[in-house]
């Protein structure tokens, strides 16, 4: 289920352009389904890759600070 959610994110983002390698690597390292579901929702709502990257980085930085 984790892999399917991750692939769903990548498929949604394909229409917006290329995912920056750094962000792709971070998303591939995620193992919590809740994190991937949150990013899936961000990807579904994103109107541009730039906006998705900004929101995803903000979320991931917040997660890193909590750990």
Stretches found by the model and what they are:
Residues 1-67:
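Elongated, amphipathic alpha-helical interaction scaffolds
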